[in-house]
Amino acid sequence: MKRFIIAPLLCLTAISALAWGQKGHDVTAAIAEKHLTPATKAAVDSILEGQSMVYWANWLDNASHTPQYAYTKTWHYKNIDEGVRYEEAPANPAGDVTTAIKAQIETLSDPKAPFADRQLAMKIIVHIVGDMHQPLHMGHATDLGGNRNKVRFFGRDANLHSVWDSNIVEAGHKWSYSEWRDQIDRVSPEEAQAIVDGSVDDWAKQSAAIAANIYRQTPDGTNHSYDEVATWTPVIETQLLYAGHRLAHLLNMIYDPAYAASFGK
């Protein structure tokens, strides 16, 4: 599985929040569940009251459109405009995907935080770690993360963001989310270690670099057909795999002292 070793892979004002579509988020959560340590799994089960991470994987996409959780709308993405370095991207005062991930980690790490706050943080982080790995959720504010980029998918009108959310996922493999998990999550322990190295910001930079490459290779009017599906499906496989392993890693670092100690924490 050498294609999954971390390397420079090909290296949004209101933006569509549906990163990966339902299946992609389910895949991320399913992979993460597979890599929770027993201590972490017990903690997650307690916080989610016996429901799975997959059960909650897509909850935030709907919740963000309700008055109660409208404040989370900007937490699904981070805007990195063309020619702007990740470190120089202006901060969104309402928050973005990276600041939101860090905030949920802080809440989940606080044993004194109210249970309801920790449960909400779990539901949120299960989703937005996946969002961060959808490259166009690190896209340009000027085109709403590809939502304004008009392309075609097998001859039908589409936008670049929707193509990456679900069209290529569905065209690449006719698998259920559990089949996706079983087929792409076949890395060695050494490869798994490489995947989780780095920080949330390091991982976000990787997604932003992929987004920049997508923009370069996909001018407006591009018709995505078999060649494009063949080109981009391995990238999607990698991003979903990384998202699942990294989500598990973040939770293991919080809930399993022995795991954290193995990383010098």
Regions flagged by a language model, labelled:
Residues A14-S16:
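N-terminal signal peptide c-region/cleavage motif recognized by signal peptidases
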Residues L18-I128, P135-K265:
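N-terminal, motif-rich segments that launch catalysis or mediate targeting to/interaction with membranes
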